[in-house]
Structure formats: C-alpha cells, structure tokens
A protein has these predicted regions:
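Conserved phosphate/anionic-ligand binding catalytic regions in large, soluble enzymes, centered on
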Residues: 107-125, 169-174
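Active-site-adjacent structural elements in folded domains
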Residues: 107-110, 160-166, 218
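Generic N-terminal targeting/processing segments that precede catalytic cores or assembly contacts
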Residues: 1-108, 131-132, 241, 248-291
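Glycine- and small hydrophobic-enriched segments that form the cores of compact globular domains
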Residues: 85, 114-119, 131, 135-138, ...
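Functionally critical mobile loop/hinge segments
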Residues: 184-291
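Acidic-glycine-rich active-site phosphate/pyrophosphate-binding loop
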Residues: 87-104, 139-158, 203-211, 246, ...
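Alpha-helical support elements that line or immediately flank enzyme active sites
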Residues: 123-134, 179-187
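Glycine- and acidic-residue-rich phosphate-binding/metal-coordinating active-site segment common to enzymes
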Residues: 144, 150-163, 167-177, 182
Length: 291
C-alpha cells in the first residue's frame, strides 16, 4: 500500500469512482505484485485468526505474571445479569477487546493490528457485528483493507511503535483503524471515514506508554477497551455527519511530533507513568524476585 496520505487515498477513490476499500486494494496489488485472489485470501486468513483468538479464549487462562486473565468473562457475566451499561454491542466490544489482549498477554496467537500491544481494538469492534449477522466476511475483509490503508499512512507519516511514539502510536493508531473500518462497513463515505480516523486518533493524542514491569499487560490490556470504545463513538459521530476541524493527515503528523516530545520514560521503558508508581514499582520488584 503506497499511499503516503489519507488525502491521496480519498482522491484515488474519487477520481476512479470506486470505494475506498477498492482504491486501497488496487494500490496494494500494484505494490505487492500479488493477485487479487491471493491478497484477499491473506486478508481472510487474518480475519479467521481474529475469530479463532476469540473462540479459543479460556476464562481460566492467566498470564505468567498473574496480571492478566479472566476479566473478559466477568464483563460477559455482568452483562448477562443486567449489570452493564451501553447495550449488547458495547458490552460485546468491551469483552472482545479484553479477550484478545488477554490472549496476547498469555502468549496465545493474535493478529498484531497494528501491534501486539493494541491487538484487541480492531477485532473487538468487528467480531460482534459478524456474530450478529450484521456484517458478512467479505464486507469485513473490505473494512480491514480500509483499516490497513489508514494504518499504513500512520506508519509512513508518524509511527506505530510505543517505544517511539508512546501508546498513542499503538492503541491510538488501532483506534483510528477500527473507526474507519466501522465507518466503511456501515456505508460511510471516504470523507466520513477520514473524519472518524482523525477523531479517534485526536482523542488519544498524548497517551503515554508506561507498562508496569515492562510487560504488555498493565495498563495495556484495559487500554485496548478504551481504544475500541473510542472507535465506536467516533464512527458513530462521523456517520452522523459530524466533522473534525483538523484533517486526518495533520492529526497523524501531530501525533508523530507529540511522540518525539515525550520523555523516554513514557515510551515503553517502564520508567514513568503507572510503571513508576509505588504499586507499579512493587509489582516489578516482586516479579523480578520470582524470575
């Protein structure tokens, strides 16, 4: 995918009178030299892995540190008992984000979308729609192409690495990708998709990467939920016609600049933020003594 800006993607779709997913797919095929059948087969495989991660989730599984596991089923049970807010979809999104992020912490197979630390965001917003029959596999794969296209632009213009840009580059990027996937899936115009991405990333600008004990668990697992719910809200706003004052490309550029301004303590080193709290330090010391 050779697009270097969101505006290039939108212009390609407009000039060829094709959907955003088709414009991104054509660009990817031109760069990768793959056949369309092969490319789609690979995307379907990624979607199937996302589904398998959720399907194979074990409520009893715990990470080696003991910091992660068992929370997704708590959310599901609370919703079944009428104790949750936000309705069926939001409860499912929350549970699915936790499931995938917990599986990552427990060394299970996940799809890095775009990173392992943010792997729960994108599948969380799509899996409930697939299960309810609101979206078929082909439509979801088209939405994944759109998500990938925007992710590629973020990678090209800024970064996807927490060590370089903080958590805004991981969960923030994943949230933007999930927002555009939802917007496209629900029939949003290319401009609405770009607005959804801009809102989602803009909302998480400045989010630091501060993993306790250097593990992708606390606060990473729960931040996947924030990224997913943020994506839903931003997609809803964009689909309603709500615009964003700052263009998507400029939001991405701002994220890159903010990342470069963050202290190294707040970029995956486990030296600042929550990792530097008394409890965070105590957890790290305890785990170090046990290893």
């Amino acid at each position: 995918m050779s697009f270097l800006s969101c505006e290039e993607m939108l212009a390609a779709a407009r000039s060829q009178n094709i959907s955003l997913s088709e414009a991104i797919l054509r660009s990817d095929l031109a760069e990768s030299r793959l056949t369309e059948a092969h490319s789609r087969e690979m995307m379907h495989h990624l979607w199937q892995v996302m589904q398998a991660t959720s399907r194979d989730y074990d409520p009893a599984q715990r990470s080696r540190s003991g910091l992660s596991g068992g929370d997704a089923v708590k959310v599901e049970q609370a919703h079944q008992e009428g104790k949750s807010l936000g309705g069926d979809y939001l409860a499912a999104v929350t549970a699915e984000a936790l499931k995938t992020a917990e599986c990552n912490a427990c060394m299970k197979r996940i799809v890095a979308a775009p990173t392992a630390g943010s792997c729960g965001v994108l599948p969380a917003v799509l899996l409930p729609l697939a299960r309810s029959g609101e979206a078929d596999e082909e439509s979801i794969c088209d939405a994944l192409y759109v998500a990938a296209g925007f992710g590629q632009v973020i990678a090209a213009r800024a970064t996807l690495a927490g060590a370089e840009g903080g958590c805004q580059a991981e969960v923030g990027a994943a949230s933007a990708m999930a927002a555009v996937a939802l917007c496209h899936l629900k029939g949003g115009a290319p401009e609405q998709c770009a607005a959804a991405a801009a809102m989602a990333l803009g909302n998480l600008l400045g989010l630091v990467c501060d993993p306790v004990a250097g593990l992708v668990e606390v606060p990473c697992v729960k931040r996947n939920v924030v990224g997913a719910v943020n994506a839903v809200s931003c997609a809803n706003m964009a689909l309603a016609g709500v615009d964003y004052a700052i263009p998507c490309d400029e939001v991405i550029d701002a994220m890159g600049r903010v990342g470069s301004l963050l202290s190294p303590d707040l970029r995956e080193t486990g030296q600042g933020g929550l990792a530097a709290t008394p409890t965070g330090v105590r957890i790290a010391q305890t785990l170090a003594e046990q290893s």
